[in-house]
Amino acid sequence: MIVAGGTGGHVYPGIAVADELHRMGIRTHWLGSRHGIEARVVAGTAIPLSLVRIRGLRRGGWLRWLTAPFIVALATAHALIVMIKIRPSVVLGMGGFVSGPGGVAAWLCRKPLVIHEQNAVPGLTNRLLSRIATRVLEAFPRSFPVQVNARCTGNPVRDDIARVGNAALETSSEGPLNLLVFGGSRGARKLNRVVPAALSLAQSTLGQFTVLHQCGADMVEETRVAYRE
């Protein structure tokens, strides 16, 4: 069972692992959140999907923090029900807020729990789960303290991305400069504000250029306004 959700940084590496396991003849089941992109992205694949109701806490304000213990308890109970029904041999937590309830459910069911951290600085969920995990994997060396005994594996990459990386990159000094602004799967508000202003100041130096700005589905209009201003 793969437990991951929230953003593409957790979901797409999980899909890469699921694809490789499928090629090896190993069945997978995905446990995610109804509010994360996995509800759309994983649902569009052949991976069986179960969803629990839980959101991240960092941007929820004091009310969400106040109700957090109840929300986490309910999500853990739901994850436990799914775990008992699916009966996975191993649970792989790839991060995101849903990994907390999923990891605890795996521990309660006495299932081997493997967690993978994609970032140089581990998130809160993986820091907590590292205390009960059977094996801890990290993309960057020394992300976890030495006593965790994490194994550095790098980040899983999907085959379609790897194939693009091996292709020759054709560039030309002629024509306008092409700039890609990428703020992650959900965008980055700070980039959405700073980059348009910076490009406005640098326009005389850069000359003609084209910008493709990945701003996040929820911030399209405010980013358009920033460029117009």
Predicted regions and their residues:
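Hydrophobic alpha-helical packing residues
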Residues: L21-H22, A106, A202
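Donor-nucleotide binding loops and adjacent catalytic segments primarily
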Residues: G36, V41-T45, N166-E229
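Short internal beta-strands
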Residues: R27-S33, L137-A139, Q208-G216
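Glycosyltransferases and closely related glycan-assembly transferases
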Residues: H78-L92, S99-V114, R127-I132
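Short amphipathic alpha-helix
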Residues: H10-L21
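Active-site-proximal region of nucleotide-activated glycan assembly enzymes
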Residues: R27, I37, P48, W107-A167
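Conserved nucleotide-sugar phosphate-binding/catalytic loop shared by glycosyltransferases and other
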Residues: I2-G5, H22-L74, A217-M219
